[in-house]
């Protein structure tokens, strides 16, 4: 069993996403393609603000990362990271075909069985010293 404190490679997740579904992992890599998202609404009607997506890239592969932002608090906030920054990410993995939710440009979506969405949902982002 891998503890959340020991970084793993992104390739390990890509190769066997089902074994990581809803597990917390620690990854290290470089931030790519930070994209702030428009506010979105949860099914309960609550609006969420400050969400963004990015890719985390390590020497083995890359993974889509979602930062959900704050719900119920109308704020305008820039992402906490920038393109090219090295970070350590603690995240919960959402793997495809489990009917789980994932964050997209259209807000929160339910992953259908045929969608190959593997997403890391950020729990904690720590900048690494260069």
What positions do the PLM features span?
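Predominantly extracellular/luminal regions of secreted and cell-surface proteins
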Residues: 17-18
């Amino acid at each position: 069993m891998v503890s959340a404190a020991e970084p793993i490679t992104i390739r390990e997740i890509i190769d066997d996403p089902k074994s990581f579904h809803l597990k917390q992992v620690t990854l290290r890599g470089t931030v790519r393609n930070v994209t702030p998202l428009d506010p979105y609404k949860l099914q309960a009607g609550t609006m969420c603000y400050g969400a963004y997506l990015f890719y985390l890239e390590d020497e083995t592969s890359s993974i889509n990362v979602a930062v959900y932002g704050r719900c119920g608090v109308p704020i305008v906030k820039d992402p906490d990271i920038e393109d090219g920054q090295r970070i350590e990410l603690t995240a919960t993995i959402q793997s495809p075909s489990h009917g789980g939710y994932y964050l997209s440009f259209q807000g929160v979506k339910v992953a259908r069985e045929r969608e190959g969405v593997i997403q890391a949902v950020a729990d904690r982002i720590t900048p690494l010293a260069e």
